Amino acid sequence: KPAGTTSLTLGTSSGIHAWHNEYYVRRLRVGKNEAIYSYLIQNHPELVEDEFFSPHDTAVISAPQKAPDGAITRSESALSLLQRVKDVSQKWVKGGHQRGQNTHNVSATITIKPDEWAEVGEWMWENREHYNGLSVLPFSDHTYKQAPFEDCDKETYDSMLKSLKNVNLDLINEDEDNTDLQGEIACAGGACE
């Protein structure tokens, strides 16, 4: 933590991961029955589009993002991220663990460039006691329709930011609370499962 949309609120990268890029578009999916969708489609339709696979009930909101100056971006090596995962696991997670055999795991998706696979495999074997599991994907500049993160240039960022700055969240009235708290139950009541 913070991860997902929580990291957007706090202005941080998502979890242990680096920022996606210096400039990028972050996409969020919302139900067409949600108050924010109604507001944006009426007032800022340039920020909203139908979700490609579920256009009847889901929309995608696109928001420009800029990493802080000097921030680590996803161009870092897989070994650099793995070392950060190990350090946080040793110094923070296991260092703060109080009782029981099971400790939490640092959730991470490691994207591996073609020339990194052998050394990453070796590192993972040699350091297997420092993680419970890792997601591993090939690094790719390939994008798919409405990807959660997509690189953009400064001009695109600036153009989208103009629209975003005019969004007035005070004008959104939520008559029904459609919040699904199931994802937060694991750490409810001050104790994580």
Model-found features: residue ranges?
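Short acidic, low-complexity intrinsically disordered linear motifs used
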Residues: 178-193
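Catalytic alpha/beta core of large soluble enzyme barrels
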Residues: 2, 9-179
